[in-house]
Amino acid sequence: MKKAITISVITIIGLLLAVLIFLSIRSSRIVYNNDNAIGNSAGNLNNGGLFCEYNDKIYFANPYDYNKLYVMNSDCTNAMKLNDDSVASINVCGSYIYYVKNNFKQETIGTIFRGQLFGVYRCNLNGESLKALYDSLSGTIALSGNSIYYQHYSDTTPLAFHKVDIAGKKDTKISDTPYSPACVHNGTIYFSDPVGKHNILSYDTKTDKTSVLYDCNSYLADVENGYAYYIDLSKNYSLVRLNTCLLYTSDAADEL
């Protein structure tokens, strides 16, 4: 009888351990996105990425609580804090939230708008299971597919263009130029070249190739649904819309 009870207890303990191991493996397994997934709009990210709407929820940096990470319904009801990180450059997709920490201090709040932030992080949609993808000074971040593209700081290169996979296992330098990844569309990142002629450039995330989309003196380029929008520095800072289907015709660009 005692032997049977002992065997039963051992069996139950074994089953419990198996369940715990299974749950641990399942909770640590990364949920991946499709190749064209994005985490936020260029307009939001170019303005600090302080909020992001996803699946009828708004994830935001609460200005009344030191820019800590909050979520609320899309009708602005039921706001609640997700964690105590002061955040910016918020991206949300699939099972995760991605953001840059601000290490908030009253005297450094302006760093959000100067792009001087500290570390790229991933957490679950409930704000838990925090994972550092990069833990030093960084700039704007954006999700494309299963990689976070971001401006990376180092002692040798003040800001460079990097990507890190959402599991945080592989970090790759793409360029020594600090391109902004804010505008992601169909697996391509578009940006105004911060050096040289300020052309609109495109970076193919599948081939890792950068090319000139349009020869112009641009700033804050944004590409959406067949059109590129940018500020033309040579036309008194006019807002210009470019039909990307007519790039090589005289009717391509219109001032707005």
Cite the ranges covered by each PLM segment.
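N-terminal Sec-pathway targeting helices
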Residues: 1-15
